[in-house]
Amino acid sequence: MKFWEKIAGETIGAEIAEAAIVLPLMFTLLLGIYWFGRAYNIYATITHAAREGARAATASTCATCGNTALIESQVATRVAQALQASKLDPAQVTPLLPNPVLKDCQTGAAVIPACASSPAICFASNVRLNDPSTGPAACGVSVSFQYPYQFYLPFTSLNGQLIQLKADVQTTGED
């Protein structure tokens, strides 16, 4: 009986020590869930903004109605509006050249996208979106950019780590 009393007597305060170990790990896990969720939300938002820019660029043009194809600054304005609607700063956008290299729809020559200055998106129109050996060429537009995101996770190597979330959207033209 004295043996059990000795063991029970030495465990006083063990709960406090266990809590001191477990609570920081649990809080780090909860913060990680929050910050990774925020990163995913920003990724979805910038992809949506790139889609909005591509959708605006592929809208049908009509000579008699007065609308014309958009240029890169107009596409950049559409992207900026979508970013601002989601409370993201368009000034933080940096250009991203698409990979693999885009090819012209008619000639197959490499196309270097035009990059607007504010926000800094890269835009190319009349580019080939598929491999011509797989069927008829699908032509459309490409909109790409990247947005910075910084993690705040204490006790990890990710604390203060800055990553670039990439948005690269290709859309076929409307008829």
Language-model features, listed with the residues they occupy:
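Coil-to-alpha-helix initiation sites in intrinsically disordered, low-complexity, charged segments
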Residues: M1-K2, G140, Y152-L153
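Alpha-helical assembly-interface signal, strongest on the long, hydrophobic N-terminal helix that forms
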Residues: M1-L83
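Generic structural signal for beta-strand residues in well-ordered domains
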Residues: K6-G9, T134, L162
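Short, solvent-exposed coil/turn segments
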Residues: I16, L29, P136-A138, L162-Q164
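Residue-level detection of beta-strand scaffold positions
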Residues: H48, V79, C139, Q170-T172
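Low-complexity, S/T/G/P-rich flexible repeat/linker segments used as non-globular hinges
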Residues: S144-D175
